[in-house]
């Protein structure tokens, strides 16, 4: 029987430390922590994430400028708003909720964010620095995943890691972070052949595909660490990519959904915000 990785507990431990950091920063008369949160349209998942961010920021004493924009906004208008925030000395971090409406150029807009305020690591420069192993803001969900893996009794260095999913937000950056930790990394996707055989070789298996209960015990190596990033709604209940109850019988460690990776994402955002002032 494996161990459930308690993301909520780890996130809470980190938040306690962050609260002290925020208090120290805010006690400095010249610096007050303030974050700008841009939401274009009314995507349900983004709205949920924004609410969680606001709740945590309020609890920690961080000011948030919520900028809610119509989904029909012109690209030039959005770029102007980002430029204003880049030049706003009060704002120490900017987060742009994704996905954006299809008429907006996501790459162009995320890259307009000042690299020193890009606390979700979305800009092309931030991505380039990540892949070169240089200091940068690391995307929040991938950073949270690495923090969770490091709580397990496994050496990332020298391990075989398999990442299912190649999104720019999770799959690609978490694969790069694992590579930076000297794991041997395989990225799988919808065109991958022999997926099950590849997964069975994984010491660390990260699934980020959004297919409910896709990963059964037949995909998991005995004693592996399994990180479930996927979220889907099934009969009004949030579930992950992994069949938790059967996989935990075979794996050494498994993250639940909810209560695993999701609990870490917002926490890593605030950690990035605080570290940006150092």
UniProtKB/Swiss-Prot annotation:
The keyword NADP applies. GO terms for biological process: L-histidine biosynthetic process; methionine biosynthetic process; purine nucleotide biosynthetic process; tetrahydrofolate interconversion. One of its GO terms (cellular component) is cytosol. GO terms for molecular function: methenyltetrahydrofolate cyclohydrolase activity; methylenetetrahydrofolate dehydrogenase (NADP+) activity. Pathway: One-carbon metabolism; tetrahydrofolate interconversion. SUPFAM superfamilies: Aminoacid dehydrogenase-like, N-terminal domain, NAD(P)-binding Rossmann-fold domains. NADP(+) binds at residues 165-167, 190, 231. It catalyses: (6R)-5,10-methylene-5,6,7,8-tetrahydrofolate + NADP(+) = (6R)-5,10-methenyltetrahydrofolate + NADPH; (6R)-5,10-methenyltetrahydrofolate + H2O = (6R)-10-formyltetrahydrofolate + H(+). It comes from the Bacteria. Transmembrane segments: none annotated. CDD domains: NAD_bind_m-THF_DH_Cyclohyd. Its EC number is 1.5.1.5, 3.5.4.9. Pfam families: THF_DHG_CYH (PF00763), THF_DHG_CYH_C (PF02882). Keywords: Amino-acid biosynthesis, Histidine biosynthesis, Hydrolase, Methionine biosynthesis, Multifunctional enzyme, NADP, One-carbon metabolism, Oxidoreductase, Purine biosynthesis. Belongs to the tetrahydrofolate dehydrogenase/cyclohydrolase family. Catalyzes the oxidation of 5,10-methylenetetrahydrofolate to 5,10-methenyltetrahydrofolate and then the hydrolysis of 5,10-methenyltetrahydrofolate to 10-formyltetrahydrofolate. Homodimer. This is Bifunctional protein FolD. It comes from Clostridium novyi (strain NT).
């Amino acid at each position: 029987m494996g161990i459930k990785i308690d993301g909520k507990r780890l996130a809470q431990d980190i938040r306690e430390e962050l609260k002290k950091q925020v208090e120290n920063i805010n006690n400095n008369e010249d610096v007050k922590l303030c974050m700008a949160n841009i939401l274009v349209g009314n995507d349900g998942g983004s709205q949920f994430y924004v609410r969680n961010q606001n709740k945590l920021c309020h609890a920690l004493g961080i000011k948030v400028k919520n900028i809610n924009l119509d989904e029909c906004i012109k690209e030039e208008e959005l770029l102007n708003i980002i430029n204003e925030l880049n030049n706003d000395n009060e704002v120490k971090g900017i987060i742009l909720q994704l996905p954006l409406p299809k008429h907006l150029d996501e790459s162009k807009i995320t890259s307009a964010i000042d690299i020193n305020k890009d606390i979700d690591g979305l800009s092309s420069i931030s991505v380039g620095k990540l892949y070169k192993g240089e200091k940068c803001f690391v995307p929040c969900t991938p950073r949270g995943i690495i923090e969770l893996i490091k709580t397990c009794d496994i050496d990332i260095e020298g391990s075989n890691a398999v990442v299912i999913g190649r999104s720019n937000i999770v799959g690609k950056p978490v694969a790069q972070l694992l590579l930076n930790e000297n794991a041997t990394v395989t990225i799988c996707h919808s065109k991958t052949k022999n997926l099950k055989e590849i997964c069975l070789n994984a010491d660390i298996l990260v699934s980020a595909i959004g297919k409910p209960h896709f990963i059964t015990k037949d995909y998991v190596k005995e004693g592996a660490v399994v990180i479930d990033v996927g979220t889907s709604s099934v009969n009004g209940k949030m579930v992950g990519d992994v069949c938790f109850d059967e996989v935990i019988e075979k794996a050494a460690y498994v993250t639940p959904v909810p209560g695993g990776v999701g609990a870490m994402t917002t926490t890593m955002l605030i950690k990035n915000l605080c570290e940006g002032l150092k």
